[in-house]
Design a protein with these regions (language model features):
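PLP-dependent class I/II
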Residues: 1-131
Length: 131
């Protein structure tokens, strides 16, 4: 029950924008606020291309601000714990009803993603992903 409630909260509260947030966003757009989609595209490309180069399996997203990456071990929570030792914050896919995967957001600065690449490379080597 707890797991189901946690997933429902994440889906309803994080993935599907509540109506209040939608109204706030509408007002922001009407007042001229804009999102720099080029920055998200640049971040996505760096993260996706680097993870693929390091041997991680993932699909390039076409509209999200995060990647779902196949964990190199069956236990996605174990993989997230190991990544944390490299100062990488990944979310277990099982938290989104996608066990065996991890979610990595790229709605941060480009420089932060650049700085994380050595840690992702070390993690990939640790799991024997790099050829």
């Amino acid at each position: 029950v707890f797991t189901a409630a946690t997933i429902a909260n994440r889906v309803n509260g994080c993935v599907n924008a509540p109506s209040l947030i939608q109204r706030v966003i509408k007002r922001c757009i009407e007042k001229g606020a804009a999102v720099n989609l080029d920055a998200y595209d640049k971040n996505r490309n760096l993260l996706y291309n680097s993870l693929k180069k390091f041997g991680f399996a993932c699909i390039k997203p076409e509209g999200a601000f995060y990647l779902f990456v196949k964990a190199p071990v069956a236990d996605d929570k174990e993989f997230c714990a190991q990544a944390q030792k490299h100062n990488l914050l990944l979310v277990p896919g099982s938290s989104f009803a996608c066990p065996g995967y991890v979610r990595i957001a790229y709605c941060v600065s480009y420089e932060q993603i650049e700085r994380s690449m050595p840690a992702f490379e070390a993690l990939a080597k640790e799991y024997g992903l790099m050829k």
